[in-house]
């Protein structure tokens, strides 16, 4: 499978299975770039029976000839990152291809403490943060008081940069939240140590990407979370603090939009959400339990049980529009194997009126009632299917319905966690932009 410059995004609320799809596409990539988010995201990859859980490091690290860049739009927790590197080394995985943007911002210990304290203070108004300090890190970045990776490489610079923010954060911790202040010298020494270990990976990300582009290398941009968690385009305020949408790749990696050739969206065959916020197709009772257990719907980062519901075609169409999707990868089709009936949300009812768009107000979204189309289930295993024609007719009908509903081709179908449990319907990079699986 040849590759151009491609963005892979989540078309729902995250946890769509982007890690597996990125892993599949990374085989042909020269460079993989993570462009936003931090350790609040997580992806699981199964390789030769080994389960590898990564939060910050791109899936492409599993390919020794691939350069993996953590871009300036990310926020880096160096302690977690080094833990991931140690895990990869313990699994005999070469990490020499890892590159870390010198301008990426760093999650400091006070960010994590403030994240948890602020969420606790919100009470019933909590937003469902992972508690990893992501929001406070991005807030400091916007307020121009953040610490960057490059600051960890020079002791005097780190001391100068940290003096004001640490004093301010300690006052907040102690006087507002009643938390013991941090020892500034201990923080400095700890983070200088992280900088020393990471220094060999630190680069000017923009120069590295444009050098690769000039050399006509294939570049894969990997987003974290999903479209409905985007700070500007998601279910605000129940969102993340960055831009997972495809446009975020330009800002978070430092490239112009003309460098991007294709955008691939990843969506589950049903829908999940972690944390708070409206979720029109959410299920309860035995159906919810069935999806949770069969789909292993527990967060990679937090371990929290994910909320499960039927496929929502309204937010799917919205994701197609916001990201300019060229094609879709549908994951976890096998999780629906035992269902006798499957429902798909095709529209909402809002205050007695049928609407077919995603409302920008979360209050309006919370009042939306799903309007479903009911489809026949296939009630047999799809896990061993390797070609489209191997799928039962009802499964084919379901995929065709999703493609028509979202008005975008389905190029990849995933039927399990392993690499080989995948049907590549057509080349997701160079395939025609047509209605796939049409009659």
UniProtKB/Swiss-Prot annotation:
Q: Which GO terms describe its cellular component?
A: cytoplasm
Q: Which note does the record give on the cofactor? A: Binds 1 Mg(2+) ion per subunit.
Q: What is its main location?
A: cytoplasm
**PROSITE patterns assigned to the protein according to its UniProt record, in alphabetical order:** ADENYLOSUCCIN_SYN_1 (PS01266), ADENYLOSUCCIN_SYN_2 (PS00513)
Q: Where is the active site?
A: 15, 43
InterPro entries according to UniProt = Adenylosuccin_syn_GTP-bd (IPR018220), Adenylosuccin_syn_Lys_AS (IPR033128), Adenylosuccinate_synth_dom1 (IPR042109), Adenylosuccinate_synth_dom2 (IPR042110), Adenylosuccinate_synth_dom3 (IPR042111), Adenylosuccinate_synthetase (IPR001114), P-loop_NTPase (IPR027417)
State whether keyword Nucleotide-binding applies. Answer: yes
The EC number on file is: 6.3.4.4
* UniProt xrefs under CDD domains: AdSS
Subcellular location as annotated:
Cytoplasm
Q: Where does GTP bind?
A: 14-20, 42-44, 306, 332-334, 414-416
Enzyme kind, highest EC tier:
ligase
- Positions with a binding annotation for IMP: 15-18, 40-43, 130, 144, 225, 240, 304
Q: Name one GO biological process term.
A: 'de novo' AMP biosynthetic process
Q: Which cofactor does it need?
A: Mg(2+)
Per UniProt, where does substrate bind?
300-306
Q: What function is annotated for this protein?
A: Plays an important role in the de novo pathway of purine nucleotide biosynthesis. Catalyzes the first committed step in the biosynthesis of AMP from IMP.
Q: Which HAMAP family match?
A: Adenylosucc_synth
Complex and partners: Homodimer.
What is the protein named? Adenylosuccinate synthetase
- What's the source species for this entry? Synechococcus sp. (strain CC9902)
């Amino acid at each position: 499978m040849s590759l151009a410059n491609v963005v892979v995004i989540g078309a729902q609320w995250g946890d769509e299975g982007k890690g597996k799809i990125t892993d599949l596409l990374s085989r042909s990539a020269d460079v993989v770039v993570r462009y936003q988010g931090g350790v609040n995201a997580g992806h699981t990859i199964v390789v030769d029976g080994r389960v590898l859980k990564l939060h910050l490091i791109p899936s492409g690290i599993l390919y020794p000839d691939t350069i993996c860049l953590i871009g300036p739009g990310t926020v880096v927790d160096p302690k977690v990152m080094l833990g991931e590197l140690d895990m990869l080394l313990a699994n005999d995985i070469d990490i020499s291809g890892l590159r870390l943007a010198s301008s990426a911002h760093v999650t400091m210990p006070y960010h994590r403490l403030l994240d948890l304290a602020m969420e606790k203070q919100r009470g019933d108004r909590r937003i469902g943060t992972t508690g990893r300090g992501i929001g406070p890190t991005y807030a400091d970045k916007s307020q121009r008081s953040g610490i960057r990776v490059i600051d960890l490489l020079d002791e005097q610079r780190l001391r100068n940069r940290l003096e004001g923010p640490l004093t301010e954060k300690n006052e907040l911790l102690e006087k507002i939240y009643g938390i013991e202040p941090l020892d500034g010298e201990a923080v400095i020494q700890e983070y200088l140590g992280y900088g020393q270990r990471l220094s060999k990976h630190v680069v000017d990300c923009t120069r590295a990407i444009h050098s690769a582009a000039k050399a006509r290398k294939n570049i894969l941009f990997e987003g974290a979370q999903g479209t409905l968690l985007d700070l500007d385009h998601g279910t605000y305020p129940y969102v993340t603090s960055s831009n997972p949408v495809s446009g975020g790749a330009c800002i978070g990696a430092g490239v112009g939009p003309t460098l991007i050739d294709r955008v691939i969206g990843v969506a589950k065959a049903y829908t999940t959400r972690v944390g708070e916020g409206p979720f029109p197709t959410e299920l309860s009772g035995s159906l919810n339990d069935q999806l949770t257990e069969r789909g292993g719907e527990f967060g990679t980062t937090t371990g929290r049980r994910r909320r499960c519901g039927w496929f929502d075609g309204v937010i799917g169409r919205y994701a197609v529009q916001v990201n300019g999707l060229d094609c879709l990868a549908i994951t976890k089709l096998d999780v629906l194997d035992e269902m006798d009936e499957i429902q798909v949300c095709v529209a909402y009812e809002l205050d007695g009126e049928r609407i077919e768009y995603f409302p920008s107000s979360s209050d309006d979204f919370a009042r939306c009632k799903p309007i479903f189309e009911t489809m026949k289930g296939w009630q047999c295993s799809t896990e061993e299917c390797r070609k489209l024609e191997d799928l039962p007719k009802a499964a084919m009908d379901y995929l065709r319905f999703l493609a028509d509903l979202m008005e975008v081709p389905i190029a990849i179908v995933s039927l399990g966690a392993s690499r080989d449990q995948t049907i590549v319907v057509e080349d997701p990079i160079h395939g025609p932009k047509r209605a796939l699986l049409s009659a």
